[in-house]
């Protein structure tokens, strides 16, 4: 999912948990999002710049160490809205074979805070609710000439389109995102059956995230 669509405040820390992935037809179960998980941390370096890193815990269970590290930069903002860029580096290492790969990624998202509720502080505590929607594009780049199976790599640029919603209540933020993954590539003749809004092109994805702002 998109990381820190709305950057943290300067000096703020946050912990994040993510669940979800491409939607697949699983025999005997049905159509469900793949239960991929990550845990992560974010830090507001500046008012418009947040640094983050995430550990992919599901991959770890299968002997692959995978992390993504990057930044969320708000390049444009107006009252209740903004545009953020998320340059990210994804790295994976197979603990059994020693094979490793990396994939650069660049996301761009527009967000809009369509509802906001604040109450005056009482006994030192105030109450805040913010509702936001966002939409954007994710660009995944595969710089390798050959795939891990030895075949020629024909998918150097892998775009995806996402829409999402953020619910913030004080320090807690809940995020839901729906994604159209790789809509320009065929989803035929592969091991997993991926339903898609574009027939035999791409796949759909669903993600849920929770993060807590420590300060």
Give the location of each predicted region.
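Short glycine/proline- and aromatic-enriched beta-strand/turn motifs that initiate or cap beta-hairpins
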Residues: 1-46, 50-51, 58, 215
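Short coil turns and loop connectors of transmembrane beta-barrels in diderm outer membranes
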Residues: 9-11, 47, 77-81, 116, ...
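Residue-level detector of the transmembrane beta-barrel scaffold of outer-membrane proteins
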Residues: 14-16, 40, 50-52, 70, ...
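Solvent-exposed loop/turn segments connecting transmembrane beta-strands
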Residues: 23-35, 52-68, 92-103, 153-156, ...
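Short, charge-rich binding segments
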Residues: 42, 60-63, 72-82
